[in-house]
Design a protein with these regions (language model features):
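Glycine/small-residue-rich loop that forms an oxyanion/phosphate-binding "nest" at active or ligand-binding sites
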Residues: 79-128
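Short pre-catalytic strand/loop immediately N-terminal to key active-site residues, enriched for Gly-Thr
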Residues: 191-204
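Short, small-residue alpha-helix embedded
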Residues: 134, 202-231, 236-246
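Glycine-rich phosphate/adenosyl-contacting loop at the front of the ribokinase-like
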Residues: 1-51
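General beta-strand structural signal in soluble alpha/beta enzymes
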Residues: 28, 50-52, 97-101, 125-129, ...
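Charged C-terminal helix
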Residues: 7-10, 225-232, 249-292
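Active-site cofactor/substrate anionic-group-binding motifs, chiefly glycine-
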Residues: 41-93
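Conserved phosphate/ATP/ADP-binding segment of small-molecule kinases
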Residues: 109-188
């Protein structure tokens, strides 16, 4: 384990354990393709899922949830109405919410919606490189849900979004990038974990956004870690987002050992999300500092 990884591993371990102990209730306004997968993933990760997207209920439920996911993967009229209502209610209630701007850039309705949501103070933003670049106004989007830009190339876009919104910005790819603004200084980390089969399983990215919302809800409980010299200097929100990615990636690594094809991998991955302890997860990932 590298010295940089070791300095973050104590925080990751404690964050994973804290999230499991809290069993956060995650309100998911997400696309219809991944609702079942997302619910199963949240349960395996120690969280509780809810899918409340009726315009008459979304705001009310957002106020009582632990965390909220707003995912633009499908934009039916009732979802377009519900998503801003839920985000506004979450902010008013002090509930963290995650924006996942799926497939924005080339498609007008979801792109307009995502930019509207961006103004509603998301706690965290997650997407692939093309989505993050498009959200920042520095790219045209990818091929549907698939990125056509590299994670490395998305660093300026992620930094721009973090500086503008105060959100922790996560860019998913072969290695994940976590970017945040710490007292006016952009900080960035690379996280290496996961497995090559993960992009071939539906919902791995969308379910990550939901899991991030649950992890973000325990950020206040992580503040006490920063008096501990064994933990690296990282904001509590950023540590929560980093730990959600570590949980997913470590489970992907273990699933890749047990399964060789997408169908069996999906089952093995959900099992691994449930099985791995905080210490197991921290030991399986590699964290390095990125130059922002």
């Amino acid at each position: 384990m590298s010295l940089v990884t070791q300095s973050y591993s104590a925080g990751i371990e404690k964050a994973v354990n804290a999230a499991r102990e809290a069993t956060p209730l995650v309100h998911c306004l997400t696309n219809t393709v991944v609702q079942n997968v997302t619910a199963n993933v949240l349960l395996a990760a120690g969280q509780a899922p809810a899918m409340v997207d009726h315009p008459g209920e979304a705001a009310t439920f957002a106020q009582i949830a632990s965390g909220v996911l707003v995912n633009t993967g499908t934009v039916a009229p009732h979802q377009v109405e519900s998503m801003p209502l839920a985000a506004e209610a979450a902010v008013k209630a002090g509930v963290p919410w995650v924006l996942d701007p799926v497939a924005i850039g080339a498609l007008e309705v979801r792109t307009s919606l995502a930019h509207r949501l961006l103004e509603l103070a998301p706690t965290a933003i997650r997407g692939n490189a093309s989505e993050i670049s498009a959200l920042a106004g520095l790219g045209a989007g990818g091929r549907g849900v698939d990125a056509t830009d590299s994670v490395d190339d998305a660093l300026p876009a992620a930094a721009s979004l973090a500086e503008r919104t105060g959100a922790v910005v996560a860019v998913s790819g072969k290695r994940d990038l976590i970017v945040w603004d710490r007292d006016g200084e952009i900080r960035a980390l690379w996280l290496e974990s996961g497995h090559d089969l993960m992009p071939r399983v539906i919902g791995t990215g969308c379910a990550l956004g939901a899991t991030m919302a649950g992890y973000a809800s325990i950020a206040p409980a992580l503040e006490s870690l920063f008096s501990d010299a064994t933990c690296a200097p990282i904001d509590a929100k950023a540590l929560a987002v980093l730990s959600a990615h570590a949980h997913f990636g470590a489970a992907g690594q273990l699933a890749g050992v047990r399964a060789g094809h997408p169908g069996s991998f999906a089952v093995a991955w959900i099992d691994a999300l449930d099985e791995l302890s905080g210490a197991d997860i921290a030991a399986r990932v590699r964290v390095t500092e990125a130059s922002a």
